[in-house]
């Protein structure tokens, strides 16, 4: 019985290992292969943030895998995203941009700022940018505020709460475990705060000062950009954030932060109002950022191979 149980365990482990390897290679394969996409004559570039936007590609082949769900997280570099928006500005096949920041992708505030500047430049080419979402997070709304029109689902919501920063301190835990952290930080280096969580129980005045400057900088860039795009006084935006006055869709509309409350199936009428042309079946053709980047890369490859 012992050897039978041991054999069953070994066989079961081998099968599980084999299946795990097959699944893992399948995920990697899906990340590295993409179906060719042909952009039609009247397409709308859809920025839905289903891809992670990253500064530069990672050399780690598993960096784009979400091991919690065992699914691929497709990535687009900031360079390719900016190149796509710049190309779309003068691409006669692209009618405009549908901004839909709900895809679950990851992007830093620095990346959002550069994307927003690229979208502002895109608008100067005379093409429309329409934003829609069921709910707007603060970063998503900051990006969406560059659009000609912003729409929100009637039962949706919005976050406009300001920027904050929190730190976790370990000194209390170390004291209970009788652990003494050996810290080397010269007295003159009081702003070198990375080691503070290991020997302090709260933020030092110096660190609080620099963190306050950092979050104020983030907030000022965001709020000033929204104020300019939406025609809302900066003091009003600060008041709305301080008082948490915007969370429901109707509140966002009342304060002028969105232009209307619509369900997504009503967006076709909005596109038509901005001169967009549908396909022969009456449906609009959308091409995602990842698909458009793949098309541009394929075009460059064809040009290089023909030379």
Where are these regions (language model features)?
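Short acidic-hydrophobic, aromatic-tinged amphipathic segments that line or gate anion-handling sites
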Residues: 151-152, 258-264
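Small-residue-centered hinge/linker elements
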Residues: 1-233, 238-242, 246, 272-307
């Amino acid at each position: 019985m012992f050897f039978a149980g041991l054999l069953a365990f070994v066989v079961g482990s081998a099968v599980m290992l084999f299946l795990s390897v097959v699944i893992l290679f399948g995920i990697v394969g899906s990340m590295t292969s993409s179906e060719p996409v042909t952009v039609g004559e009247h397409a709308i570039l859809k920025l839905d943030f289903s891809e992670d936007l990253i500064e530069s590609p990672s050399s780690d082949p598993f960096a784009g895998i979400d091991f919690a769900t065992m699914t691929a997280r497709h990535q687009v570099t900031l360079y390719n995203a900016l190149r796509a928006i710049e190309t779309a500005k003068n691409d006669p096949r692209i009618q405009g941009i549908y901004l839909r920041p709900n895809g679950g992708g990851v992007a830093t505030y620095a990346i959002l700022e550069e994307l927003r500047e690229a979208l502002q430049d895109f608008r100067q080419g005379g093409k429309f940018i329409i934003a829609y979402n069921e709910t707007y997070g603060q970063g998503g709304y900051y990006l969406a505020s560059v659009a000609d029109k912003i729409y929100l689902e009637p039962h949706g919501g919005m976050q406009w709460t300001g920027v904050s920063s929190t730190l976790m301190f370990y000194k209390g835990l170390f004291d209970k475990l009788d652990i003494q952290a050996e810290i080397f930080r010269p007295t003159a280096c009081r702003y070198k705060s990375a080691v503070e969580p290991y020997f302090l129980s709260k933020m030092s005045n110096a660190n609080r000062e620099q963190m306050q400057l950092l979050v104020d900088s983030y907030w000022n860039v965001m709020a000033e950009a929204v104020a300019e795009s939406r025609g809302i006084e900066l003091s009003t935006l600060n008041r709305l954030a301080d008082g948490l006055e915007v969370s429901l869709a109707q509140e966002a509309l009342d304060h002028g932060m969105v232009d209307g409350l619509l369900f997504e199936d009503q967006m076709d009428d909005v596109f038509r109002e901005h001169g967009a042309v549908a396909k022969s079946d009456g449906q609009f053709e959308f091409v995602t950022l990842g698909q458009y980047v793949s098309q541009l890369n394929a075009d460059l490859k064809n040009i290089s191979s023909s030379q």
